[in-house]
Structure formats: C-alpha cells, structure tokens
Amino acid sequence: MQSMPLLLRQSFKSTLNLTRTTRPVQRRPLLPAVGPNSLYPAPRNFSICLQCQFRTQSSLYSSDSLKDGKPAEQPKEDASPVIALPAGNANLEADAGSQQQAPPAAAEAGESTQSQQQQQQQQQQQEEKSEANGKGWGDGGLPSYIEQRRSQFTKRFSDVMDNLQSNIFVAGQRLNDLTGYSAIEMLKKEIHRQEERLRTARLQVRTAKDAYAAAINNRSTSQREVNELLQRKHAWSPTDLERFTHLYRNDHTNEVAEHEAQEALSQAEHEAEEAAAQLSKSILSRYHEEQVWSDKIRQMSTWGTWGLMGVNVLLFLIFQIAVEPWRRKRLVKGFEEKVIEAIEKEKALDRIQIVTAQNQMAQESSTTSTASTATPETAETAETAEPSASPADEPIADTDAIVTIESTEPEVFSSDPADAEPPANTIVSKPTPDNIREYIKFQLARVSPLLESLRQYLHDLFSDRQVVLTQRDLSTVALQSAAAGAAVIGMLSMIIRQR
C-alpha cells in the first residue's frame, strides 16, 4: 500500500505536468462485454499496488462463475477508487510505479459490470416468465391464448348459445306471423295507446272543470261586489266609483273567460268520450280476433290430433296385419326347420342302429357257421335224429347266407349321424305308392303345424282362460281400442260427408 504523503505528491505532480505532456494519450479501444474469453489479457503493470489492480480487473477472475451459468458478483462498494495518471509523465512513472492503463481497465470493468447486470435482468425475466406459466397466469393463461386454443365446434356452440335468445324470439315472431297472432299484437299496442289517450283526456277534463269553476267563482264574486256597491250607491266615495267602474269593465272579460272555460270543458269531455269509445271498440275487436285465432288453433290442434291418431292406428294395423304374421310365420318356419332337422337326425340314427344290429347278427351267424363246420359229426347226428325237419328253415339259412355275404363288404360309417348316408339296400330306384303316400304325409306334416298353431291362437283368443293383467296393460288396451274405434268412425264420417 502507498502512503498518504506519496499519493498527495503524485497528485500534485500530475497537476503540474499536465501542461507539459506532448505525447498523446493512447487508450485501448473498448470491447463489448461478451464474456471473459473475449477480453484482452490485462497487462501486468508495475506491481506497486496489486490490490487496486485486482479490484479494477475483477471481471477477469470471475470466469468460473460465468461458465457455471451463475451471475458474476458485482464489485464491492467499499473498493478504493482507482487513480488515473497520465501516460506521458516519466517522472511519475519513475517515482510511483505507473498505472498507465488504468483508465482502459476501469472502462472494461464498467462494461463488464453492465453486461453482468443485463445478464441478471434477462435471467430474472426468464424466471418470472417460467413462474407465470407454471402458475397459469402467464402466456398460457391469458384469455387470448385460451381463445386461440378453442376448437371451431366450441366457438360455434358458444355463438349459438349466445344467440339462443334472439333465435327463440325470431322463431316466435315467425310462428306468430304464420298463425296470424301478429295482428293481435298490433291491436294490443293500439289498445295501450288508446288507454294513454283516454288517461290524458280525462286529465284535461279535470283541468277544464277546475278552470270553469274558477271562472264561475270569479264572475260571481265580481257580480256580488257590484250588487253591494249598487245597494249603497248614495254613499259612494271616489274609490267606490273607481271600483265600480273597474268591476263593470271586467264583467265582460269574466263572462268571456267563463264561456271559453265552458267550451274547453265540453271539448275535453267530448274527446274523453271519443277516446273511451275507441278504446272499447279496440278491446272488443281484440277479443273477437283472439277468439277467432283460438278457434283456428283449436281446429288445427284437433286435426293434428286426428292425424296423429290416424298414423298410430295405421301403424297398429300394419303391425297387426303384415308385421306380426310375418314374424309369426318366420318363427314357425324356423321351428319347423329345427323339428324336421331333429327328425332327420333321429331317422339317421335309427338307420345306423339298424345297420349296426344287422352287422352284429351277421357276425354272430358267421361264428355259428364256423362252429357248425368244426363239429360235423354232431350235425350229422342232429340230422338223423330229426329227419322230419320243416322246410321253413331253408329260407332262414339262405337269408343268413345273404347276410354273411353283405357283411363281407366293408362299410364305413361317419362319426356325424346327420351326415351318415343310408345303406344301399334302403335306396328305392322306382316310385311306389307307399313312397308317394309317405311323401304326401311328410308335406302335410309340414303344413299341419302352422294350421294347428293358428287354430290354437284363435281358440286362445276366444277361450275362457284366465289372464292376469296390470292396470297399465288394461289402460293401454282400452286406449288402443278407443283410438281404433275413433279412427274408424272418423273415416266413416269423412266418407259420408264427401258423398
């Protein structure tokens, strides 16, 4: 550290030698503070005051913190000021050890501090923006941003809901125009106007009555005073004479005012009567139009009700005549097909069982024939023992032989009884009366279930079978019957009217 007298001496010498400097002061150009890597390396001046040099060039020693992304610390406020000395004074350099480039270093330090402050401000703004977005009131929470993110369908739906009241009003106005209620609305407005007119006319009548009464009172008062003056005519004073003259002159004016008030009263009464008559006429016209409109709406509703009832009856008849039989026929047909399929399966199974039984009998007969050949002696003794054997046994032997011959042919049976083919001996090549009779019976068997089901349905409709119904079902049946009867009667009445 330099001593206080040395600093004073340096400052004094600098003030004396400022005028003798012939060398221009050369300063290093200032560079933008983009970071510690872009700055020039600070030259090492005379190491008289390294602490001051460190304070002035503090930005060069904060590269680690800038690399880590943290803002560099600002220089302390209690740092000692840098003494700027001229570069051309050789005596000052010899005495105190120069700091020739102190002003450029100070400028660079100022630029670095400004850049650090700007970086801090930018980081603070980014943090505030991120916090605002996180909380929901930043750019993502603004109404304009939310409005942009809305879909087209949502916007259209909101517009429709906003204009719902106006649309309903317009629809009601159109409906009134179609039904003729707009004229009734105009009559209502006219009635309100007539009521206001009648109210004003009555107020005018009241005012005219008050004015007429005031005019009558004024004239009667003046006439009374004139009569009093005439009674004491012999004792008139000049004042009484002037008063009598004034009253006599004003009597004509009072008479004219009375007549005018009377005419105004009669005119106001006439106008009030006319307004009342017009109002009553408008009210009667409105009631008449409303009655006509209500009759028209009632007639339209009646025809609409009849139309709906006719549509319901028509649908009922269509379902009962066309749909229900078709559905029932379809169900019966499906049931018949299933029954026929089951019968065919049973027949195939019976045939397979018969064939298997015949095979078993053939096998048993073959075993018995082998046993008979093995013991011929026993057979001969049996023949001698029974010489008078019946010739009916020979066809049995022949059939056994035939069965054995048929059993020698291999037969393959399918695992599915429905797909199993009938044996060859059951196939008939020529139609016989028995086969025709069976075919006819089979066709009649297919038709008979349908007829039987229809017969049972009709018998069930008119049978004495007890049925438990709920009140709802009973009411539905009654309403349907009433609707059908009303529809039939309405159709008959329309036909009769047309004729």
From Swiss-Prot:
| Record-level GO cellular component terms | mitochondrial inner membrane
Q: Name one GO biological process term.
A: inner mitochondrial membrane organization
Q: Which cysteines are joined by disulfide bonds?
A: none
Name where it mostly resides.
mitochondrion
Membrane topology term: Multi-pass membrane protein
Q: Does the keyword 4Fe-4S apply?
A: no
Query: Mitochondrial matrix side: which ranges?
Result: 497-499
Biased composition of type Low complexity is found at: 96-125, 364-392
On whether Transcription is a keyword of this UniProt record, the answer is no
Localization (cell): Mitochondrion inner membrane
Q: Can you tell me where the transmembrane regions are? A: 303-323, 476-496
Provide the membrane-side ranges marked Mitochondrial intermembrane in the record. 324-475
Keywords in UniProt for this one? Answer: Coiled coil, Membrane, Mitochondrion, Mitochondrion inner membrane, Transit peptide, Transmembrane, Transmembrane helix
The family database entries (InterPro entries) matched by this protein are listed as: MDM33_fungi (IPR008839)
Annotated coiled-coil segments of the chain = 181-283
Q: Where is this region: Disordered?
A: 94-144, 360-396, 410-431
The entry describes its oligomerization and partners as: Homooligomer.
| Family to which the UniProt record says this protein belongs | Belongs to the SHE9 family.
**What function does this protein fulfil?**
Required for the maintenance of the structure of the mitochondrial inner membrane. Involved in mitochondrial morphology. Causes growth arrest when highly overexpressed.
Name the chain's protein: Sensitive to high expression protein 9 homolog, mitochondrial
Q: Which organism is it from?
A: Aspergillus niger (strain ATCC MYA-4892 / CBS 513.88 / FGSC A1513)
- Tell me the name of the encoding gene: she9
